[in-house]
From Swiss-Prot:
<keyword id="KW-0547">Nucleotide-binding</keyword>
<dbReference type="GO" id="GO:0051301">
    <property type="term" value="P:cell division"/>
</dbReference>
<dbReference type="Pfam" id="PF08245">
    <property type="entry name" value="Mur_ligase_M"/>
</dbReference>
<keyword id="KW-0961">Cell wall biogenesis/degradation</keyword>
<dbReference type="GO" id="GO:0071555">
    <property type="term" value="P:cell wall organization"/>
</dbReference>
<dbReference type="InterPro" id="IPR000713">
    <property type="entry name" value="Mur_ligase_N"/>
</dbReference>
<dbReference type="GO" id="GO:0005737">
    <property type="term" value="C:cytoplasm"/>
</dbReference>
<dbReference type="InterPro" id="IPR036615">
    <property type="entry name" value="Mur_ligase_C_dom_sf"/>
</dbReference>
<keyword id="KW-0067">ATP-binding</keyword>
<dbReference type="GO" id="GO:0008360">
    <property type="term" value="P:regulation of cell shape"/>
</dbReference>
<dbReference type="InterPro" id="IPR036565">
    <property type="entry name" value="Mur-like_cat_sf"/>
</dbReference>
<comment type="function">
    <text>Cell wall formation.</text>
</comment>
<protein>
    <recommendedName>
        <fullName>UDP-N-acetylmuramate--L-alanine ligase</fullName>
        <ecNumber>6.3.2.8</ecNumber>
    </recommendedName>
</protein>
<dbReference type="InterPro" id="IPR005758">
    <property type="entry name" value="UDP-N-AcMur_Ala_ligase_MurC"/>
</dbReference>
<dbReference type="Pfam" id="PF01225">
    <property type="entry name" value="Mur_ligase"/>
</dbReference>
<comment type="similarity">
    <text>Belongs to the MurCDEF family.</text>
</comment>
<dbReference type="InterPro" id="IPR004101">
    <property type="entry name" value="Mur_ligase_C"/>
</dbReference>
Length: 436
């Protein structure tokens, strides 16, 4: 790839910032625009010296190659200006689809577990061979002359159909975007279409009934804990230090593996990584070494200690993700009370999953909900957080300006979950806890 100047419209988006970092590492000039409000991704961009500008059509210059975030429509002033200047314009997924062509590429798709699995795979392969990667938590690394390129493949609006990877891990299929997909059949159709673009093999979770139906031109290997899975985890042991298991491929032992991660899903994610490494004939002992020193990805069970409290920040916003996060908290802290603070994400999703939210949030020892986080597409709805708390014993709605109800808990774990701006609630709690 010859050196170029890439201009990102929406550079602070999690995928966009990761891609900007990859191109910067590969020796290109990179800059971009976004809102001025602080976003967690800009820390990495600033550290790399990548210029972030406020939106302004005057930013665009002749010779730039433009990469536009998928949330910006063609009538955005900067996109219009880029067209006037005759600049080459790519959408994020289109550009990524081109970029991965020069590598042994491994995508990770699925409604849940994408970022955690991509992060684990990127970390593990990086310790064994030259690996470039793009993770949905805003982390990206471009290594010149890489063998592997690991990337997160998002099914939203069928964007992942821009990718033709060598391998694809599919963690699960779920009806997670009711604003775009019409139902499970529609989501399955997208995954099957993508499966038929994979060049070497698919690694799919064996307990997902939809993934079990996959028909593809390449082999589909299933991973899980049952005897019918191709890659099987046996002798699983989960304790307060992490999770360990023996990995088998068709009854042949690959090796023993440990990850310092928590929750049932962590074993599955690690097994998927082992499966890809096994197909690429990588040394199982080296893979075990790298899995054992993984430290996690941003906003996935990110922990801190303050006073006598453990505070966890997690991106979980779908019922299955909340269940997995609370399960992880119970595994790591079996003797502490688990307090859930959840910010529902969008009215349509909250309404679609109301009974499931009630069920999974009831697993916590105490539950608080913030008001619903609305998206740019959807400002109001027919449901309120109070509709959910009313169905959970002892649950209540909590507001950023009054986090005092959390001060009654001591020597406990508070798990903040959400995909919106839940961090501002966490920050407000930390402020009053520190002052107490």
């Amino acid at each position: 790839m010859t050196e170029a100047t890439y201009y990102f419209i929406g550079i602070k988006g999690s995928g966009m910032s990761a891609l900007a970092l990859v191109l910067h590492d590969l020796g290109h000039q990179v800059l971009g625009s976004d809102i001025t409000q602080y976003t967690f991704t800009q820390k990495g961009l600033a550290a790399a010296g990548i210029k972030m500008l406020p939106f302004d059509p005057a930013n665009l210059k002749p010779g730039y190659t433009v990469i536009a975030g998928n949330s910006f429509t063609d009538d955005h002033p900067e996109i219009k200006r880029a067209k006037e200047l005759g600049l080459t314009i790519y959408r994020y997924h289109e550009f990524l689809g081109k970029l991965i062509e020069g590598y042994t590429s491994i995508g990770v798709a699925g409604a849940h577990g994408k970022t955690s699995t991509t992060g684990l795979l990127a970390h593990t392969l990086s310790g064994v061979a030259k690996t470039s990667y793009l993770i949905g938590d805003g982390t990206g690394k471009g290594i010149p002359d890489s063998k592997f390129f690991v990337f997160e493949a998002d099914e939203y609006r069928r964007h992942f159909l821009a990718y033709h990877p060598d391998y694809m891990i599919m963690t699960n299929i779920d009806f997670d975007h009711p604003d775009y997909y019409t139902g499970f059949e529609d989501v399955y159709d997208a995954f099957e279409t993508e499966a038929n673009q994979v060049k070497k093999a698919i690694v799919a979770w064996g307990d997902d009934p939809w993934l079990r139906k996959l028909k593809a031109k390449v082999p589909v290997y299933y991973y899980g804990i049952s005897d019918r899975d191709d890659f099987q985890a046996r002798n699983v042991d989960r304790d307060t230090k992490g999770s360990s298991f023996d990995a088998y491929f068709h009854d042949q032992l690959i090796g023993h593996f440990f990850v310092p991660l928590f929750g049932e899903h962590s074993v599955l994610n690690a097994l998927a990584v082992v499966a890809v490494a096994h197909m690429e004939k990588l040394d199982a002992k080296l893979i075990a070494r790298e899995l054992g020193n993984f430290s996690g990805v941003k906003r996935r069970f990110a922990e801190k200690d303050l006073k006598d409290m453990i505070i966890v920040d997690d991106y979980a916003h779908h019922p299955n993700e909340i269940k997995a996060t609370l399960d992880a908290a119970r595994q790591k802290y079996p003797d502490k009370a688990i307090i859930a603070v959840f910010q529902p994400h969008t009215f349509s999703r909250t309404q679609a999953y109301e009974p499931q939210y009630v069920q999974v949030l009831s697993q916590a020892d105490q539950t608080f909900l913030t008001p619903i986080f609305s998206s740019a597409r959807e400002k109001t709805g027919k449901i309120r957080s109070e509709d959910i708390t009313a169905q959970i014993k002892g649950a209540a709605v909590i507001h950023q300006e009054d986090m005092k109800p959390l001060l009654q808990y001591h020597n406990a774990v508070v798990v903040f979950m959400g995909a919106g701006d839940i961090q501002k609630y966490e920050k407000a709690y930390e402020t009053i806890l520190a002052e107490e």
